[in-house]
């Protein structure tokens, strides 16, 4: 027996009665249900059947409700209720996702929707394509304009191969069966979707993008996180206060924060470049200490980038019978141990002894090894330990 899906005709129905049609352990099937089993990236509902908690809902032809510790029997009439506050939050989130992606796609038609995740804890979607805050700002303005316009949100069923379906956003490979449910937001968006939605955009009250996260790989997906309703309003107030405080700290006004930060970053980069230039000169002038036949070059520097430190270590290690121990300290300590090929010295062993002092990790080859750890408090001790290890190894020869 196929479950009658009450949420398809009335997504606002929160209480209903039904008859138990099947029981399998903790899982209960009903002849009809308002519990949405999840779909379109939206979480499944939670709620109660006869005051017993429904902890999970699974879809299919027959909707299954997980009700631990129940004693229901086939044929029993039951009263059920979904967690409406949770459901309505998810409905708002799902409609907001449709609205926001649609406005973003209008600005950049190359965007492709990859994945959706609408849960009580987090509402987001993933897109492939170029996304930046300028695009998001424009899309948000249009989306919130649609919310203010109180646009109707409707749905219709259509044949999978009908002309109507050809005009909507759809991933055909995800459609099972011959019918497609089309959800429309006014004339702004039409998309194939199995989720439950609000009836009018005014229920969203407000939409706010709170975070963009790009995949590390170039050209990877971008995660767009957002809030709706009161959560969006509260977050907007907090971010507004942060912006005002930041502007005050920068000696600027809120409208000029970005230009002030750009200037500050440029100034910081100039300072870093000056520091790198000074560091290169300082490291190049390092004089080796003679320990028998061994030449030992060592030094600790403030805020030198990894490449500069490694290049300098390589340069010194080109000289015969030379061991090198260099460190850069800032928020992290970076340590480099290198040696000329004519030395019987395993730089990895020396580095590991020094890393034990720092509590960090590292690796490399016999003639070149690097490691790092948070903090700078024990950087001097780590360098001293590396030098001690080198001395011990050559004193034994």
Task: Give the location of each predicted region.
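Glycine-rich, acidic loop segments that terminate in or are immediately followed by a histidine
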Residues: 41, 186-203, 211, 217, ...
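Short, hydrophobic/aliphatic alpha-helical segments
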Residues: 20-34, 75-88, 175-190, 344-361, ...
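A conserved active-site cap/scaffold subdomain adjacent to cofactor or substrate pockets
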Residues: 198, 203-258
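Active/ligand-binding-proximal structured segments within catalytic/core domains
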Residues: 34-49, 73-126, 367
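Hydrophobic helix-and-loop "lid/oligomerization" segment in the mid-to-C-terminal part
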Residues: 244-331, 339
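A generic structural motif
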Residues: 28-30, 60-70, 122-129, 336, ...
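Conserved nucleotide-binding/hydrolysis modules and their immediate coupling elements
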Residues: 1-76
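Functional cores that coordinate and move charged inorganic groups
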Residues: 86, 106-221
